[in-house]
């Protein structure tokens, strides 16, 4: 398993995203200088665009604050989303890092970022009402726990909401099945 955090100290320079995230997964040698990048968020944002969706200037609701979710949060803010509501458990080991990341993004972008309690299903419903996209950045629903879902099973999604999941196994999670129905 690569050590994305250790790579930060081995680089001469970091991209803005890599610096904020604190992790590097791609190193480019530019005339002997090692430039560290984090492409996780870039890849996610490109996949949304490739699927035909333009979410720049709009609102995202993001579930989770782990490594992948943080990369998505950072890139979405850097790319120009207007607003992001991040749902995380206050007891999460990632919570303090999330607060720091949000503070840093608030200083360098115009994106409004709100940290929300993951267990507040009423607030989730309210935030989704004016969101363009819901992104599951957690592992909830990943094999071998395919029967789990990060949102309440009785949640009704707004008609035009894009629902995405970073989970790759199973290919269609319970969350995505709920969104299709």
Model segments located where?
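Phosphate/diphosphate ligand-binding glycine-rich loop within oxidoreductases
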Residues: 1-51
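Short, charged/polar "capping" segments at the starts of alpha-helices
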Residues: 7, 92-98, 171-174
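Short helix-loop-beta connector
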Residues: 30, 53-59, 157-159
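Glycine-rich adenosine-cofactor-binding loop
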Residues: 36-38, 57-81
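Active-site glycine-rich loop that binds ribose-phosphate moieties when present
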Residues: 43-48, 54-55, 67, 72-74, ...
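NAD(P)-binding Rossmann-fold cofactor-contacting core
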Residues: 79-109
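Rossmann-like adenosine-cofactor binding region
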Residues: 111-181
């Amino acid at each position: 398993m690569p050590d994305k955090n250790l790579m930060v100290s081995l680089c001469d320079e970091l991209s803005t995203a890599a610096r904020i995230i604190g992790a590097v997964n791609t190193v480019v040698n530019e005339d002997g200088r090692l430039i560290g990048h984090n492409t996780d968020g870039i890849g996610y944002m490109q996949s949304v665009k490739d699927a035909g969706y333009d979410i720049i200037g709009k609102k995202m609701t993001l579930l989770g604050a782990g490594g992948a979710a943080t990369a998505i949060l950072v890139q979405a803010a850097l790319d120009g989303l207007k607003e992001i509501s991040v749902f995380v458990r206050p007891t999460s080991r990632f919570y303090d890092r999330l607060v720091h990341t949000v503070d840093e993004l608030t200083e360098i972008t115009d994106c409004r970022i709100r940290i929300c309690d993951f267990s507040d299903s009423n607030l989730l419903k309210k935030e989704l009402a004016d969101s363009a996209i819901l992104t599951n950045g957690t592992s909830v629903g990943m094999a071998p726990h395919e029967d789990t879902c990060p949102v309440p099973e009785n949640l009704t999604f707004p008609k035009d909401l894009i629902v995405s999941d970073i989970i790759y196994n199973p290919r269609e999670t319970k969350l995505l099945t709920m969104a299709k129905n």
